[in-house]
Regions:
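TPR-adjacent "capping" and linker segments in tetratricopeptide-repeat scaffold/adaptor proteins
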Residues: 34-49, 103-126, 143-144, 192-200, ...
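Aromatic (tryptophan-biased) beta-strands that constitute blades/sheets of beta-rich domains
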Residues: 57, 120-123, 237-319, 340-373, ...
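Short solvent-exposed coil/turn linkers within tandem alpha-helical repeat scaffolds
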Residues: 35-38, 42, 76-96, 106-111, ...
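Repeat-blade elements of multi-bladed beta-propeller folds
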Residues: 203-206, 266-269, 312-335, 361-412, ...
Length: 719
């Protein structure tokens, strides 16, 4: 893995950068990892490696025709496989070929265009005739270095802009900025730069400034505008529907921040971490009064854990409720519950004697205990989209012991909330995905986009394999199934293993942290891998540690405005990537196990484990931290961002901490005042709910809970 080359310029143009705010910060010194032994096996084709060697030989001999011919052949025949662009970073072969072509001399590029321009022209004309986005996508994926590649990038960028996909617009327009004399003399195939566009570069740069502005990066936009005025003070063009001097048009727009409608604040928690980007902030802090109601959650076998986690609690806080309108829903391995979050009554009922169980029917048979030992932490997630609830049900075991007698299958179920009051629409069993006597398991709950859902698949034999699959959200029918990576099994064959991987969905791209040495980006349309990065994986085999919820978290990637944050559970590194390219922005070793990426604001990334930390999102520098030194005061459950504050649960209290400055505003006692415990926090309306291991508790708005004076909390380390 490497630090993003050339600073992160999503493009650097002289002293002018079009990144997010990366260039403005002073990053901490970082050590670039040397080559390491990768823990995963990837679909890298040896034939491609050999043919790429031939391409380089022909280039060195200036045999342009032969080099271009082989490169086109490689892209056509092996385009969907992976190529090691740099140590620890892999690109799809078709993309790497285009990146490489962009660095060819003009005479070689001319030969390439003679061969591919007729096809690219046909696609471009189809797009102009009203065939939509796909012909343009065909150009960018198969003929980006054609004479029509820049036009396709420009039009796709405009479409993304109009749809509010600002990070996607940035990544498309950024590729139109050519390299300059100030760049490294060694051509870098890590990022694509169209070398000879005839589009007006100042106009494209001005659009990139607007992207920064409308993403809420006001200081970055001001900086970029200042650099733009120095370089292109007399440039004219069209911007935001107006013709004129581009600097003046920019100044007029940037002078009015009220034009910007930020999407940081979200209304309802629809999935784990609130949103499918895994980045959620409630608009307003909850009004925490007395306990309004509580619901005891019956235990199932998968919660009665065999290992003993910290403090004698056998059951981890593994329930993650979701909210839809006036109802809150949560599930365990066997049942899905629905409650009215205002009253605590069963969903769609005024009768307290009604059953809160939406799924399954009363005739459902209770699961049996596995025959072989179980290692891991059971967790339960669901997703609400389009008025439907999608949940991962069944055995939490994802890697079944070789001699396990029981069929430990898992299910995906879809319930109709808006029209059917929780009626089952369809169900998929992992038993249906059997392949050569080896059964797949569903990992965590899916993410949903339009009429498609995406979920991680796992199987433990003959090797550990992680896939991402796409299903119809309407019928449950599989659309595609993409292998991500293989790895050797680290847990002995006679043990069942529990995992719960979750995808992240950001601007129509999927992201997955595999927790076994790889992080990947996939295309939602066809499942093709966009990029994959590897890192040194710590081979964890201690059963007690793997089964201790205080030692391992549920940490999918967090996507925020073009940056992807990752804290793999098999690594001590916290990392930030450019989400479009997979290039590393920064990484830093972490002093303790990160169990939650809680959210990212305009300037701060919030993470938690035993303690709570705020980091500069641009550099990874720790700006503040808070928490107890006593292990009994460590973080317990998942917190939530609301307004300007973080509500962070401990076992016996909730700390309310300012997100940007890290000062303690309030300490809410749970155990002492109400005999309650911490857990996973949920905000429904203006109420706070706590999903502790055995109970869901709702706090009303009447009778404020007493808050301890933060000045007396000497055990807290606040910085």
């Amino acid at each position: 893995m490497q630090i993003l080359r050339g600073c992160i310029a999503l493009f650097v143009w002289g002293a002018f950068t079009f990144s997010t705010e990366i260039i403005l910060a002073q990053p901490e010194p970082q050590v670039i990892s040397s080559r390491f032994r990768e823990s995963v096996s990837l679909d890298v084709n040896n034939t491609v490696l050999k043919k790429m060697g031939s391409v380089r030989d022909y280039l060195s001999e200036q045999q342009w025709e032969d080099a271009v011919k082989i490169l086109i052949q490689i892209s056509d025949e092996y385009g969907d496989s992976l190529y090691p662009e740099a140590p620890g970073r892999y690109l799809r072969v078709s993309e790497y070929c285009q990146n490489l072509l962009a660095g060819f001399p003009p005479e070689a590029i001319a030969i390439y265009r003679e061969k591919v321009d007729p096809r690219a022209k046909r696609w471009y004309e189809e797009a102009l005739a009203g065939s939509g986005r796909q012909p343009l996508v065909n150009i960018t994926e198969q003929a980006l270095m054609s004479s029509y590649g820049d036009d396709a990038l420009n039009l796709l960028g405009e479409m993304a802009w109009e749809e509010g996909q600002l990070a996607e617009a940035r990544s498309l327009w950024r590729k139109l900025i050519p390299r300059t004399a100030s760049d490294s003399p060694v051509y870098d195939t890590g990022l694509f730069h169209y070398p000879d566009t005839d589009l007006p570069v100042p106009e494209i740069l001005a659009r990139l400034i607007l992207v920064s502005f409308f993403q809420g990066n006001f200081s970055q936009a001001d900086f970029e505008q200042g650099q733009f005025r120095k370089k292109y003070s007399q440039a004219t063009g069209r911007l935001a529907g107006k013709e004129g001097n581009l600097s003046d048009l920019l100044a007029e727009i940037l002078a009015d921040p009220s034009r910007v409608s930020l999407t940081d604040n979200r209304s309802e928690l629809k999935t784990f971490a609130g949103h499918q980007t895994r980045n959620f902030k409630a608009a307003q802090p909850p009004e925490i009064g007395a306990v309004d109601w509580s619901f005891p959650v019956p235990l199932v076998w998968s919660q009665e854990f065999t290992a003993k986690p910290a403090f004698g609690f056998r059951v981890p806080p593994g329930l993650f409720p979701v909210v839809h309108q006036e109802h809150v829903f949560f599930n365990d391995a066997e049942r899905i519950y629905g409650l009215n979050w205002k009253t605590g009554l069963p969903a769609w009922s005024q009768d307290p004697q009604s059953s809160p169980i939406l799924y399954p029917s009363a005739s459902h048979r209770v699961s049996r205990l596995p025959f072989r030992p179980v290692v891991g932490v059971p967790r339960y997630t669901s997703t609400i989209a389009g008025g439907r609830l999608y949940a991962r049900m069944g055995s939490p075991v994802t890697s079944v012991a070789k001699d396990e007698r029981l069929g430990l299958f898992s299910d995906l179920v879809c319930l109709d909330l808006d029209q059917g009051q929780g009626k089952l629409l369809w169900k998929i069993s992992s038993a249906q995905l059997r392949e050569q006597n080896f059964v797949w398991s569903f990992e965590g709950a899916p993410v949903v986009s339009g009429n498609r859902l995406y979920v991680v698949l796992h199987r433990g034999f003959p090797e550990v394999q992680t896939n991402v699959a796409c299903f119809s959200a309407d019928t449950g029918e599989m659309i595609w199934n993409q292998k991500v990576c293989l790895a050797l099994r680290s847990i002995e064959e006679g043990v069942n293993y529990i995992s719960h991987l979750l995808l992240t969905l950001g601007e129509d791209q999927l992201y997955l942290s595999t927790d076994m040495g790889a992080i990947a980006s996939l295309n939602t349309v066809n499942g093709k891998l966009n990029w994959l990065v590897t890192y040194p994986s710590q081979d964890k085999t201690d059963k007690e540690e793997l089964s201790n919820h205080m030692k391992t978290g549920l940490v999918p990637c967090l996507y925020d405005r073009g940056i992807l944050f990752a804290a793999p559970q098999d690594s001590s590194q916290l990392m930030a990537f450019d989400a479009e390219s997979g290039l590393l922005l920064w990484q830093r070793p972490w002093p303790e196990q990160i169990r939650n990426l809680l959210g990212a604001t305009q300037s701060t990334l919030v993470v938690s484990g035993d303690r709570l930390f705020g980091l500069n999102r641009a550099t990874g520098r720790i700006t503040w931290k808070t928490g107890y030194h006593d292990p009994e005061g460590f973080g317990y459950g998942r917190g939530i961002l609301a307004g300007d504050f973080i509500y962070w649960p401990l076992r016996e209290e909730i700390l309310v901490v300012h997100t940007e400055q890290g000062y303690l505003k309030q300490k809410i006692s749970l155990r002492k005042q109400y005999g309650a415990t911490g857990g996973n926090l949920v905000i429904a309306g203006n109420q706070l709910l706590i999903a502790s291991p055995r109970r869901l508790t709702a706090f009303g708005t009447d009778g404020q809970i007493p808050a301890n004076d933060s000045k007396k909390i000497s055990a807290l380390s606040i910085k």
